[in-house]
Amino acid sequence: MGKTILTPKQLEFLELVKIEPEITKRFYLTGGTALSEFYLKHRLSEDIDLFTEEEEVDQKLIEVYLKKNSSLLSIKKIERSVFMGLMSYFLIFKDDSKLKVDFNYYPFPRIEKGLKFGKLQIDSIRDIAANKVHTIFVSPRDRDYIDLYFIMKNCNFKLDQLILDAKIKFDWHIDKLTLV
């Protein structure tokens, strides 16, 4: 895989996820970790975002999967948090380090297919860019501006095209002035 920005815990987790058919047929990796690890290598990212286009997220399936792999990953405790319908799992390892993993329904169809890591689909850089534009419009965070800057710099995407992609994907009016 070459140079990685993943922590050893993130890598171990994704190495197991990429071979689990019950997870890989439902979920894809997206967000800052996908962007940083598989496309740009520009920053560290702390969590793992696994999204599905299936309306019902099977909590039981996820919990069984996490418990089944607890000993392989040296997990001593799993905490679940639900905030505004978003489900996060906090994996607490025997060395007391933590990894946040989100398993969530994302109702917006992807623009194009991305890469694959084993059997795990990785969101395309174009989709991640459109998601970043939407996120900046709705709830800006510094890291999203940083990600968008590096996407545009390294991928020759133009802001107008990314705004159009976000408008189409999210059916939302977004203008340049709001993004700054």
Where are these regions (language model features)?
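Compositionally biased terminal segments of proteins
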Residues: 1-180
